[in-house]
Amino acid sequence: MLRLANRVSRKDSGNLGIAQLKKRLLATSGVSQGEILSKYPIGLNMHGYVIEQVQPIPEFSLVAVKLKHSRTGSEHLHLDTPNDKNNVFSVAFKTNAPDATGVPHILEHTTLCGSFKYPVRDPFFKMLNRSLSNFMNAMTGHDYTYYPFATTNAKDFENLMDVYLSSVFEPLLTHESFMQEGWRLENSDLSDPKSPIIFKGVVYNEMKGQYSNSAYYYWIKFQEAIYGSLNNSGGNPNEITDLRYEDLVDFHSSNYHPSNAKTFTYGNIELVNHLNKLNEFFESFGSRGIRTNVRKPITELNPNYESDVTVKGPLDTMSSRPIEEQYKSSITWVIGNPLDESKLYDVFKWKVLSSLLCDGHNSPFYQELIEKEYGEDFAVNYGLDATTALLSFTIGLNNLSLEKAKNLEDKVRGIFVEKIIPELQKGKESGFNDRIEAILHQIELNFKNHKPEFGIGLLSSVVSTWVNGLNPVKSLQIDHILNRFKEDYKLNGLKMFQDLLDESVLKDDTPKFKFTMEPDESFGKNLTSQETERLNKKIEALTEEDKEIIYKRSIELAEKQKKEEDVSALPTLTVKDIPREGDFYPLDFADINSKKLQKRIVDTNGLIYMNATKDISYLPSKYYEYLPLFDCCLTNLAGTSKTPITELEIKIQKLTGGVTFNVSAKTDPFDISKTNMKFMLSGMALKDKSQNVYDLWFEILTQTKFDSEDEQVVDKLFTLVKNLGQNQMNTIADSGHSYANSYSNSQLTPTKYIHNLIGGIGQVSFISDLNRKLETEGRDFLKKELLPVLKDIQRHLVNGFTDGNHSGFEYSLVGDSESVIKNEKMIKEFDDLLTANSNRVAGTNELSSLISQFNSNKLGLNNNGRSTLIDLPFQVGYASLAKLGAAYTSKDGAALRVLSQLLTFKHLHSVIREANGAYGGGLSFDGLGGCLNFYSYRDPNPLTSVQSFKDSTSVALGKMINSENNGWSPKDLQEAKLTIFQGVDAPSHISSQGSLDFLEHITDEMRQERRERFLDVTYEDLKNVTEKYLLNGSQDIVTVIGDNETLKIDSSDAQWNIKKLTA
């Protein structure tokens, strides 16, 4: 399950961190808001609930209805929209953590391990393959826990709502579930009662994985220092092992009661249906006093709080910086309380101001701190943050020297006084005004840009403040706040922001807080030593009888995990609920200068989406690993010969919804040994501003500056390469299974080989190499080596062609009929201009040569059957075993996808997560890429998981051979198919309609054929593909990411290739 930090990220630059509040649904229904309002008179009693507030939210095309359950006091929020069939439900609880043992987090897991109505071991995971939901989760925040799902199927909604309510209000909370999901002592070898006793548990290992992420570690230690009263709800691994089972049961009894519950529904299902179900559950409960119990930050609890805190933290072993320059430090100002309803407008102004000061190339803090190399990157807590009752503004940096860390506050104050205030005082002459206009334009676009997860987004935007007493309806009324802001800005201009700063950051008595993390070379070893010490203390306190009990309980738990359960009590959909005919979008086609134009005519609420793609098989393969950097440079370097980057950034934000450039390798849907390279352009705009996208495409493509003699270009590239090198360790820690899979797959197909180069461990190594050269050779490396390569890539991508027909870009449009007609003319003008300004580069088909070398094993990839360990200092590991599968159009592809679901839910979930203690694991089949991937995530024993992967073939064959006796049943097969169709039939973004045809060359006919194959897969098909691909297929390609200090693989072991990633 996910853990949340409620903060406004600097990555949300265009939308101020409230993107999920700014999406308008398409008004396609004939039902007016007046008709909806008439259904909900104030004071009406509906199944034990009384309507307290009804509010139209026209910016979102919905009506908000707030109700209270008369008997228990539970609040319910319903968002009625006839336009969206993707219905959402959630139940949330206020759950203040009493300590750092992780009791709210572990309870979140264990509630989903069986209930009185559904007494099966893990109804949550079992419902994942008995449903057509497109979202199911449970999440723990700082002081709240919530359980949301989304589905387009009304019967499915009813089933899931029943399971969720039973799970949270009447869970079994068995001791076995606590041991499995929380923590336990267990013999390392269950066949040997004398084997060493170790710690195990899903949440325990999840949080060990979190603590391996240095950004998370900095963030959580910062939170503990400034807001210690909240405690660490996720759990500190050092303290999780102090949690008692009785504490878990007591915490549930105290907090999981309707009086402490906030329930939420969204969509087009009638409210009365939801209330009837809720009332059935709640009528057996009495009323409790509602205790919001909002905890306070340290600045309010203690007038003499410690305002300058330093703690020790981990090194970034992949950083090129010396240890003494790996300090992290931040200065934080407390600027308000986000729970104060009267201050909602001030919070919005702060979001705008934070974006103005912190986001993008134009922001003063980026220019003064990053570009001028005071620090290399912003700290994770940088920007505006709203955590419970604390609204704060933080400037923080990574990779500082001790002296710079000590002087950070003076440096930041100097930027405020010498740069920001003078700029604000310029009034209408300030460049800030253009940026304000750009920010407002992005808000307007986000109102219009329809996303399929709209309901989940609205829920996520209100739940953290709602559980703490803020009226959620007020939080949704964005139009009112936005209009007030526009009037205020029109009247007062930039003075409104100067006033904000004068009243807070620049005011001497404003509470502030400095937090620094000192790099500790022995940090990882100390964590390991602390764990060993804790374990030894617990073992020393055990009697021989205790050890016997531990062994017996572990055996019993293992047997229960293996035991086949009767899950007939759980509700389920069937394959009959899946339409045999898929939903397809009509596409039109035309020619533009003999190049294909694909058109999807649909109402897009005043927006137009455009894409272009070009075959770049001619590009020299030596340039592939440079391509992500090149893509990044197009919108992040010094700009173009016509427009500097500061102006270009504003132009993009003021005139469009964004323009992007990227390169990708695509697998041939008929043959996985074939691939093609595509250069893709994307854009989105209001339909009356669409010409700007083509103008920007052309200018950026043809005029981006890569001049070695231009010092601004060199400086920008220096900063960019440094930024890309930051936090690579954290990225791998968060998605280690993806990196392990990518590395394994790179030895199977040419497409996956390229993917690893441009987005996997190969790219991580490449960026590390660039940073190492930057440290040793300085800017000369950029001038003499890197910039000439980037310039040559630009020349090839703009001017090069695959064949003598001078074929270039193909195009696609998604928009209403009028907009598409106008854009056809714009595309022709763009294409003519591009052709007229290009000088053809004669190119060979380099990609064909690479494919040939790959398929004949001439790229040096064959490890001769050896497994690979990517040695990184993580507390937990990630394992991958890859095998070659089948092409998209192969009949085998459908059977392999079904097989992957069966093995995941009917075998691997039990052995990898429940028994081995990993956070997750399974088997996936990439239908487009053709690779099978066994994987584990945040795994304490990745080598054990690898063996489990290898054993899975015999398990699968045994289940199919013994289908009459302890084998896989027709119901199991049905559930596997249901799981697949959760993704196949999930709502899609309107801009992606037709994208499979355009980008992957997968037609509606191919999709329909594959759909029917999914539905028609038999056990005979599964047996055939198991034998063909798992038993007799390609050799096993194994990759493990983890710490060899723990794994202890001998470097001389001929079965292993150990790869150490360092700067």
Curated annotation (Swiss-Prot):
Subcellular location: Mitochondrion intermembrane space; Mitochondrion matrix
Stretches that traverse the bilayer: none
Cofactor: Zn(2+)
Keywords for this protein: Hydrolase, Metal-binding, Metalloprotease, Mitochondrion, Protease, Transit peptide, Zinc
Pfam family, one: Peptidase_M16_C
One term of GO molecular function: ATP-dependent peptidase activity
One of the GO BP terms on file: proteolysis involved in protein catabolic process
Transmembrane helix is among the record's keywords: no
Cofactor note: Binds 1 zinc ion per subunit.
E.C. number: 3.4.24.-
Binding annotation for Zn(2+): 105, 109, 206
InterPro entries: Metalloenz_LuxS/M16, Pept_M16_N, Peptidase_M16_C, Peptidase_M16C_assoc, PreP_C
Active site residues per record: 108 (proton acceptor), 181
Subunit structure: Monomer and homodimer; homodimerization is induced by binding of the substrate.
Chain's role: Degrades mitochondrial transit peptides after their cleavage in the intermembrane space or in the matrix, and presequence peptides; clearance of these peptides is required to keep the presequence processing machinery running. Preferentially cleaves the N-terminal side of paired basic amino acid residues. Also degrades other unstructured peptides. May function as an ATP-dependent peptidase as opposed to a metalloendopeptidase.
Family per record: Belongs to the peptidase M16 family. PreP subfamily.
Name of the protein this chain belongs to: Presequence protease, mitochondrial
Organism of this sequence: Debaryomyces hansenii (strain ATCC 36239 / CBS 767 / BCRC 21394 / JCM 1990 / NBRC 0083 / IGC 2968) (Yeast)
